[in-house]
């Protein structure tokens, strides 16, 4: 089977832009361990917020028949995706929730204050709070991305989170949660990806097959030989797609299904195209998105299921 990426990263900008960035970096490296900010490096390595905001808005409208206006980004970190959602339309609002105060403060200074004007800022709210404790205001859509819900290590805790998402959504609202897996993610290994002026290193550091706990780390290395070791450290549980689907259904979501990423046969990595599948491929590593919809008020489970069945999603 084709081997896919095992690193939890999202598609970056266009190939032309990547080549341009790399060319500039080759002339004069921008980053060293002393000067580089880890959040900047993370956003350049892992996130594609403008693209994600566009894609999830498109998926939401395909599933529901209405535009995505109110978004909640759980585990939002620097809230860059929420910022881009607010920028997309003058009626868009966003709520970003994260426990880490310094990360939220960094996001406000470097993302909110630089990407948004005063009117747009008025439509964005950032909360330093536990995602289990936030229910208001209800949102059209909740995103739980970059596998951050994996901080919940037992079924009871993750189930409580999914139930809270259900209660926090408006009728007909959507929950999207990305997931990763495959035999390759269980191996102790370090994947290195060159970026413009630095190298992103995804370290699958430790895995316990009994608890399904995995420790992952992100390191950054630079052309001058310096490094930022363990810039980010994650203590996660690897949740299976079957477990996630069951928890979504138990919480009350309807038409719970999986969008499975296809393979780029030229390089064996993910191709950024997600399609609904009932049976996954036996790939060494894979990326997928679990989708659930809260029933419309007064509607049964059949109507929304029929409306969304068979639709495909693209992230490119």
Give, region by region, the residue ranges found by the protein language model:
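SAM-dependent methyltransferase
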Residues: 176-247
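Conserved SAM-binding loop of SAM-dependent methyltransferases across substrates and taxa
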Residues: 78-91
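C-terminal lobe and adjacent flexible extensions of AdoMet/dcAdoMet transferase-like proteins
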Residues: 238-316
